[in-house]
UniProtKB/Swiss-Prot annotation:
Heterotetramer of two alpha and two beta chains. The gene is argJ. This is Arginine biosynthesis bifunctional protein ArgJ. GO terms for molecular function: glutamate N-acetyltransferase activity; L-glutamate N-acetyltransferase activity. Keywords: Acyltransferase, Amino-acid biosynthesis, Arginine biosynthesis, Autocatalytic cleavage, Cytoplasm, Multifunctional enzyme, Transferase. Catalyzes two activities which are involved in the cyclic version of arginine biosynthesis: the synthesis of N-acetylglutamate from glutamate and acetyl-CoA as the acetyl donor, and of ornithine by transacetylation between N(2)-acetylornithine and glutamate. It catalyses: N(2)-acetyl-L-ornithine + L-glutamate = N-acetyl-L-glutamate + L-ornithine; L-glutamate + acetyl-CoA = N-acetyl-L-glutamate + CoA + H(+). One of its GO terms (biological process) is ornithine biosynthetic process. The keyword Acyltransferase applies.
């Protein structure tokens, strides 16, 4: 079923010839009204020009009207030309939409170190037809993903729709992929930005596929107010639900992955320590390999936990895998064959109780397979 965008938003895409595969690779997301926006971007020191430009636009505090995305070329590490090409992409999109370049955010994803084919973007932008539906945009922004990622929610009549891409080079650091959430709710910009920071910390920053943070990651929330005001608490609960669903989709679609890993940590001294502990477990290559092999190797979970920086007493901590208690201060008697069978599920849950306080947090990851190595041995980054 087609997902309709919130009131006032339109999107579209085309095949501009940026991807060697010939798949759709150039997309626009447009608001008919000036939108308040909140933005989180990669902290990678080799960030792409699109990130530097996005930060400058964000600091200006001015409304946003559109996003232009190219998938297939990161436009990163190409010297001063990359900055000029990024500005040119914004100018071309603004010309296509009748806007000023300062109202247009750019995003790029794909191969690093290759000059951006601006001439293909110039030719492709006029070919993009805009509709009130999400699917064309969601498809065009993909790179090594195996499926589009779209989620939606409704809060007191206002709609929230999220679109994301991400499969590899995914690791927590202020975004972790490309994600675009749009809503027709009317939300003051200051409240939008504060709430978005909390949502990103709890969702997108809790995804890890391979421990590598991309140079181009961003997570954006646009609110154009076309519907009107809604209760802020309920609104951000809806935003977090959409972001969490997208985060799970990204982890489930990790390069070469066969299963989703959900790590829940409770009883931490603080929420931040719980999130940190969950991320450490979800990101452990040893545990991810054991997960692929259906090996209930709780020692790898405990070792990752010990390296997380979260406070706990190993003699009190409790580890449960797929509902099966494995460890509580010492190994517990359990049926390894039964536990291994339980790990064959498409979604595997690790529950850890640190017994230090009330802090709780989740992280999302996947198993580590031979296919991950194969994909990244063949894909030029």
């Amino acid at each position: 079923m087609a997902v309709r965008l919130p009131r006032g938003f339109r999107a579209g895409a085309t095949r501009a010839g940026i991807k060697p595969s010939g798949r759709p690779d150039l997309a626009l997301l447009v608001s008919g009204l000036p939108a308040a926006w909140a933005y989180a971007a990669t902290q990678n020191r080799a960030a792409a020009p699109s990130i530097h430009r996005g930060r400058a636009l964000y600091a200006s505090g001015k409304p946003l009207r559109a996003v232009v995305v190219n998938a297939g070329n990161a436009n990163c590490a190409t010297g001063e030309r990359g900055y000029e090409d990024d500005r040119r992409m914004a100018e071309l999109a603004a010309l296509r939409l009748g806007l000023s370049p300062e109202e247009v955010l750019t995003a790029s994803t794909g191969v690093i170190g290759v000059p951006l084919p601006v001439e293909k973007i110039a030719k492709g932008l006029p070919e993009i037809g805009l509709t009130p539906f999400a699917e064309a945009f969601a498809e065009a922004i993909l790179t090594t993903d195996t499926r589009p990622k779209v989620a939606e929610a409704e809060v007191a009549g206002a709609r929230i729709v999220g679109l994301a891409k991400g499969s590899g080079m995914i690791h927590p650091n202020m975004a972790t992929m490309l994600a675009f959430l749009v809503t027709d709710a009317l939300v003051p910009q200051e409240a939008l930005r504060a709430g978005w920071r909390r949502v990103v910390e709890r969702t997108f920053n809790q995804v890890t596929v391979d421990g590598d943070t991309s140079t181009n990651d961003l997570a954006l929330l646009m609110a154009n107010g076309a519907y009107g005001e809604v209760p802020l608490k309920a609104f951000f609960e809806g935003v977090e639900a959409v972001a969490q669903e997208l985060a799970r989709m990204i982890a489930r679609d990790g390069e070469g992955a066969t299963k989703l890993m959900v790590v829940r940590v409770v009883g931490a001294a603080t929420e931040e320590e719980a999130r940190r502990a969950a991320r450490a477990i979800a990101g452990s290559a040893l545990w991810k390999s054991a997960l692929y092999g259906n090996d209930p190797n709780w020692g790898r979970i405990l070792a990752a936990l010990g390296n997380s920086g979260a406070r706990f007493d190993p003699l009190r901590v409790r580890i449960v895998l797929q509902g099966i208690p494995l460890y509580e201060g010492a190994v517990l008697p359990f049926d390894r064959e039964e536990a291994g069978q339980a790990m064959r599920a498409e979604e595997v849950e690790v529950l850890v109780d640190l017994r230090e306080g009330q802090g709780a947090g989740e992280a999302y990851g996947c198993d580590l397979t031979e296919d991950y190595v194969r994909i990244n041995a063949l894909y030029t980054t």
